From Swiss-Prot:
Chain spans, region Lycopene beta-cyclase: 1-243
Protein name, UniProt field: Bifunctional lycopene cyclase/phytoene synthase
Biological or metabolic pathway of the protein: Carotenoid biosynthesis; beta-carotene biosynthesis; Carotenoid biosynthesis; phytoene biosynthesis; all-trans-phytoene from geranylgeranyl diphosphate: step 1/1
Family that this chain belongs to: In the N-terminal section; belongs to the lycopene beta-cyclase family.
Protein EC: 5.5.1.19, 2.5.1.32
NCBIfam families for the chain: CarR_dom_SF
PROSITE patterns tied to this protein: SQUALEN_PHYTOEN_SYN_2 (PS01045)
GO MF term list: geranylgeranyl diphosphate synthase activity; intramolecular lyase activity; lycopene beta cyclase activity; squalene synthase [NAD(P)H] activity
Localization annotation: Membrane
Alphabetically ordered keywords of this record: Carotenoid biosynthesis, Isomerase, Membrane, Multifunctional enzyme, Transferase, Transmembrane, Transmembrane helix
């Protein structure tokens, strides 16, 4: 009896598990728990027969003086625990690294395959894995120096072949932060741990079953291969799981109303769905939405990564529509052209929400009247989950913007509130509608109405911050969103702001605007606790990420550079993590 192997866990595997748990805990969702538990179960069940065979046939062994004693099918409990903790650690690292990535954009249709040679890549991968399995089988039959290597290959190879065949698109297409990095980091770490353990004799590979080659002094090549392939298995398993979820949630025509915790059978059916059945238009909508969000709102893109799959999809599509509508109006060459775009958008909403208008009519209108690069944003708007009025109010906010060409439409505080409600409060209301559509809630209709009203107020707060940040930028395009009543109180008017947006008196008004923003924020933030629990954290991140801009502006001596206040990425991440805690 001994504690050497147990001490390996206490020193080297449990501390990373604790640290990764603390790091990821604020982001942990039910689906994450499901994924990790599922993979841990598979890892234990799949490894026990293989490991038991190795021990019984003395391929490797554990001296009595290094283990506590209890075994499961001749496997020391410390080794069984290792199956669990390795899978847990690598899975959590994958979740941390992949969280920012919106993975559905990496799905490809049959048409994409023709351009990307996906089928050829799949076949090459399958051929390599089949070759490795065949060589492993040969090594085992020879019962020589390659026995241990062969046993590793014929055990891991079939699982890798299955996962590759099902999820090769994700394995190849996703960024290295989602694929290579979560394999390399834990593998290098375990190579170091294994080197220390082998030197101390914690476990021993029997002579005659190994090549005797070392990756470096103290690390047998077979052990290096084992840890590499087990981490590849874990990450490929996570990728296959996420591939299934992406298909499940991205294509409602294939899987209407999917469960947030789908059964293994549903996940398998999702993975087996032919890519020829994918909705190419929807994938285009996702890709363009992500591209717009990355360009236009880094704070919201960071916040969007904290939302779960289907809600994140809907929010991205909603943002894409709002962004496209705003750009159509803002980029118009004349006021008359801008009014025409707003009229076309009103017509689009009329067609979408009229029960007697068929879908093809909406599509025809979009193709005839709108630029090509706006089609996906319009046609993929999740209108079936949204009421029409907030969208119409958003367009009314754009109409207020057009009034700047004659005179400022914002004469008073009331005008400023109305404008902010229309261009930002409406977006907050629609976000809440999407949340209540996805997650069940026991709130009464009256309480839901209060939550939506609070969301409207929070939208006003965020718009106030936006206006405070962009005073200089807006002045360059001839717009002053500060109420003329406020300007008169300090001896200014719209013309003086347009000529010199850096006037010290404007800084005082910026401070007043931010004070009002934080008043709206304080009034509305308690209502977040009334939202379904799954959405509370992500909504707080979205709000706090933007309000951090306001806090930056309020700092003594802070100077807005190039017309905008930028919160560094590290600070945005810190705000998100602190908020979720």
């Amino acid at each position: 009896m001994g504690f050497d192997y147990a001490l390996v866990h206490l020193k080297y595997t449990i501390p990373p598990a604790v640290l990764l748990t603390l790091l990821y805990r604020p982001l942990l969702t039910k689906i994450d728990v499901y994924k990790v538990a599922f993979l841990v179960t598979i890892a234990v069940v799949a490894t026990i027969p293989w490991d038991s065979y190795l021990i019984r046939n003395r391929i490797w062994s554990y001296p009595d003086h290094v283990i506590i004693g209890p075994t499961l099918f001749d496997i020391p409990l410390e080794e069984v625990f290792f199956f669990v903790v390795q899978t847990y650690n690598t899975s959590l690292l994958y979740l941390v690294l992949s969280k920012p990535t919106f993975q559905p954009v990496y799905l490809c249709t049959e048409r994409d395959e023709l351009h990307g040679s996906w089928r050829l890549k799949r076949l090459i991968g399958q051929a390599i894995l089949l070759g490795a399995i065949a060589w492993g089988w040969f090594c085992v039959r020879e019962r020589g120096l390659g026995t241990y290597t062969g046993l590793i290959l014929i055990w891991a190879g079939p699982f890798l072949l299955l996962l590759w065949s099902l999820a090769y698109q994700f394995i190849i297409g996703l960024p290295f932060t989602n694929t290579l990095l979560p394999i390399v980091l834990p593998t290098l770490y375990l190579w170091i741990v294994d080197t220390l353990a082998l030197r101390r004799g914690t476990w021993v590979i029997s002579p005659g079953t190994k090549f005797g080659v070392h990756l470096w002094d103290g690390l047998e090549i077979e052990e290096a291969l084992f840890f590499l392939l087990t981490n590849v298995l874990i990450v490929f398993g996570q990728l296959a799981f996420d591939n299934a979820l992406a298909v499940l949630y991205a294509f409602p025509h294939l899987f209407p109303d999917p469960s947030l915790l789908p059964s293994p059978a549903t996940l398998i059916r999702s993975l087996l769905t032919s890519c020829a059945q994918y909705d190419e238009a929807r994938l285009t909508g996702f890709r363009e939405a992500v591209s717009r969000l990355k360009r236009k709102s880094r704070s919201f893109y960071l916040a969007s990564s904290t939302f779960q799959g289907p809600l994140r999809m809907d929010l991205l599509l909603l943002y894409s529509f709002c962004r496209v509508a705003d750009d159509l109006v803002d980029n118009a060459a004349t006021t008359e052209e801008a009014r025409q775009w707003i009229a076309k958008l009103h017509k689009f909403l009329d067609n979408v929400y009229r029960k007697d208008v068929v879908c093809s009519s909406v599509t025809d209108q979009v193709r005839k009247e709108f630029p090509l690069d706006t089609h996906s944003a319009l046609l993929q708007l999740p209108c079936c989950k949204l009421s029409a009025e907030p969208l119409r109010d958003l367009l009314r906010g754009f109409e207020m913007d057009l009034e700047f060409n004659s005179t400022s439409p914002i004469q008073s505080t009331e005008d400023l509130v109305l404008y902010s409600e229309r261009v930002a409060g409406t977006v907050a209301q629609m976000c809440i509608q999407l949340i209540f559509h996805l997650y069940p809630s026991s709130l009464t209709a009256e309480k839901r109405h209060k939550v939506v009203a609070a969301g409207n107020s929070m939208g006003v707060a965020l718009q106030y911050v936006n206006i405070a940040r962009d005073i200089g930028v807006d002045a360059k395009i001839g717009r002053v969103y500060l109420p003329t009543d406020w300007l008169s109180e300090v001896g200014l008017n719209c013309d003086t702001v347009l000529k010199d947006p850096k006037d010290p008196r404007i800084e005082a008004l910026r401070g007043r605007l931010l004070d009002d923003a934080f008043s709206f924020y304080e009034e509305a933030k308690l209502a977040i606790a009334q939202l379904p629990i799954e959405a509370q954290g992500p909504i707080r991140v979205a709000v706090e990420s933007y309000m951090e801009i306001g806090r930056t502006l309020k700092q003594d001596g802070f100077i807005v550079k190039a017309g905008r206040a930028t919160v560094p990425k590290w600070r945005r991440v810190l705000v998100a993590w602190r908020t979720l805690n």
